[in-house]
UniProtKB/Swiss-Prot annotation:
Organism: Haemophilus influenzae (strain ATCC 51907 / DSM 11121 / KW20 / Rd)
Listed NCBIfam families: glycyl_YjjI
Descriptive protein name: Uncharacterized protein HI_0521
Pfam assignment, any one: YjjI-like
SUPFAM superfamilies from the UniProt entry: PFL-like glycyl radical enzymes (SSF51998)
InterPro entries named in the record: Glycyl_radical_YjjI-like
């Protein structure tokens, strides 16, 4: 959406933002002062779909000066050092950790902070010599990130192999109980030891991380050199994504009187307009912003422009389906309706067809095609209250665990750049991590790409794809300043989608067949 000079003054006077949060917000406002019809060449039809909220650009801005998500290959630093930052290759763990922290402060993104900090266990494993001493260093390193990158879209990867560094990292994240960094384990039961998987599952229950990514599935789509960044965004490593534009499917559907009208008339029009705006944004960031021409990350091989792509996202599949079920006179809801699954599948098949047919701009790494993405939700507009995250079943309408897994699994195949489902377990599962890993294995065998768990009664929980402390959200809602900007987003997303109240998965729910 367009910004105004008043937005600048409102931000300057805000009493619930830190200095750095004001700085970030002011930068975003500056990007949105330009009308994209003038600057980027948006058509009136494209702008109209943004104005009526069917297309959402997540307030990315229009004078774009860096890609949205950047996933550097940090192994370049481990092997060669960094000439621009005058860093030689590290010789020990202290130098590796220090150099990585320096690098992170020079990796931009839509949040101004790094959204990807690498495959930490792979980067650090060569330097592990004394596990107890090295644990203290790794814990201090992770705590430093939490306090200087106050944004839990910052994401670390571990796995798939069991390593000393990986175990030390998991031990540290359990002890710290910090929202940042977000974390994913690239899991493959043919590569990941059972003991390491159960340790990761325990950490996931206690501190909501790491989530489990189906490593083999993502490799089949993106190749070995990929990373999971931000929420659960799977993208080429040494690259990333220029932009993320999403469709509010619930908003689109509510203007239609039938599934046929949505599938064959309105949805194709809106989707093609969204893809066109992405083309124009890509051209600007590559051809006009000079980001790649001026960045040492590009010059020294941490990133390559040709490894970037675009993310075409959806929210509100449940809401679109529920509306179209009502149009057919059915008193059923997405998640518990055979006809609902048929409608939702038809919507996704249509979107895949449109996306596959579109020749993307500057997206060589992904075959000049943009990647569909199941976006985690936001609170940018009142319409977000009427569009559940991604393809997820609305909170309060969830079936039992097995039925939920079987219902949601078929939709994961549509989203090579990321999707995921979340399940809140009761306290007893901390002592039964083997059962949690069995559930994850079962989900992956059904076609899941990504799954996460957490304990219902913990303070640190996963909102959608990122983490917040419920205690910090309560402080923010009282008007107090919050350290992490993701606290704002967590508060808003909970107000829109009740994500703090997901169905509890106790033993009775887990073993139920329906």
């Amino acid at each position: 959406m367009l910004a105004s000079l008043q937005d600048i003054l409102d931000t300057v006077k805000a009493n619930n933002l830190t200095y750095h949060q004001k700085l970030m917000t002011l930068g975003n406002i500056a990007e949105r002062l330009f009308d994209p019809r003038d600057l980027l060449g948006y058509t009136d039809e494209e702008w109209g779909f943004l104005q009526n909220q069917m297309i959402c650009d997540l307030c990315e801005g229009y004078a774009i000066y860096r890609p949205r998500y950047i996933l550097p290959d940090y192994n370049v630093y481990i092997q060669k050092g960094c000439e621009f930052l005058e860093l030689p290759p590290p010789k020990d763990l202290d130098e590796a950790l220090d150099g990585l922290l320096i690098l992170y402060s020079h990796v931009p993104s839509i949040t101004t902070y790094p959204v990807y900090i690498g495959r930490l266990d792979v980067l650090l494993e060569p330097f592990i010599t004394d596990e107890e001493k090295d644990y203290i260093k790794i814990k201090r390193f992770l705590n430093h990130i939490d306090k200087t990158v106050p944004d839990s879209f910052c994401h670390a990867n571990i796995g798939p192999y069991d390593t000393k560094a990986g175990r030390l990292i998991l031990r540290a994240v359990i002890d710290l109980e910090a929202p940042t960094p977000n974390m994913t384990i690239r899991y493959d039961k043919s590569k990941t030891s059972r003991e390491f998987a159960e340790l990761a599952a325990k950490a996931c229950l206690l501190v909501s991380k790491p989530s489990f990514a189906n490593d083999a599935y993502y490799i089949s789509d993106l190749g070995e050199e990929y990373g999971v960044a931000s929420c659960y965004n799977a993208l080429p490593e040494c690259g990333g994504a220029y932009t993320l534009t999403r469709l509010r499917l619930g908003t689109i559907a509510r203007t239609c009187k039938s599934a046929d009208e949505m599938l064959n008339e309105l949805l194709p029009r809106v989707a093609k307009c969204a893809l066109s705006t992405m083309d124009k944004r890509h051209k600007f960031v590559v051809e006009e912003s000079n980001f790649f021409n001026s960045s040492f990350l590009e010059k020294e091989g941490f990133i390559k422009r040709t490894n970037f792509t675009g993310m075409f996202a959806i929210v509100g599949l449940a809401d679109a389906t529920n509306h179209l079920l009502q149009c057919e006179g059915l008193n059923e809801t997405f998640g518990k309706s055979v006809r609902g699954d048929e409608i939702a599948t038809a919507i996704m098949d249509k979107l895949k067809e449109i996306t596959d047919a579109h020749e993307g701009v500057y997206a060589e790494r992904t075959g000049n095609r943009y990647l569909l993405h199941a976006q985690v939700g936001a609170s940018n507009h009142e319409e977000d209250k009427r569009n559940a995250p991604a393809h997820r079943i609305r909170v309060g309408e969830e079936p039992t665990l097995l039925a939920h897994l079987k219902q949601s699994a078929p939709f994961h195949k549509y989203f090579p750049s990321g999707t995921g489902d979340l399940f809140a377990f009761d306290q007893t599962y901390v002592d039964h991590c083997d059962a949690v890993v069995d559930i994850i294995d079962g989900a992956f065998s059904l076609g899941y790409r990504y799954i996460t768990t957490y304990l219902k009664n913990t303070d640190l929980i996963r909102v959608t794809g990122y983490l917040v402390k419920k205690s910090e959200v309560e402080k923010y809602r009282k008007g107090e300043v919050a350290l992490r900007d993701t606290t704002w987003y967590g508060s808003g997303t909970d107000e829109c989608a009740n994500v703090f109240d997901r169905q509890l998965r106790d033993e009775k729910d887990v073993i139920a067949e329906k």
